[in-house]
Amino acid sequence: MIRLTVLYNLKPEVDEAEFLEWRLTDHQKANSSMPGVVHTDFSLNTLAWPKDTQPRYRFMTTAEWPNMKLFEEAFYEPNFQIELKNGVEKMLEDYTFLIGEILADHNEIT
């Protein structure tokens, strides 16, 4: 399983309420409909460690694909890369994109 993790902050001129409205509707649908995506989520980071420190990144998005081939086909598709670059340049200022292979996983239904 391949996981894309994007940690980011918005540019000061980006209205957070408007961003969240878009991010939780149109953009969430776009993320979940990317070819091969089996899971995606979006979070607001409110706590960090050590205790009483502020999170470096306000937002985090993850998306998962079953294998590297499907990830690369979707993520590195030229039109998607253009859209991604434009979106990042327009809205984000401090960001990190991490691509990792999941080596261990545990899910518990409570």
Regions found by a protein language model. Name each.
Residues 1-110:
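Macromolecular interaction modules
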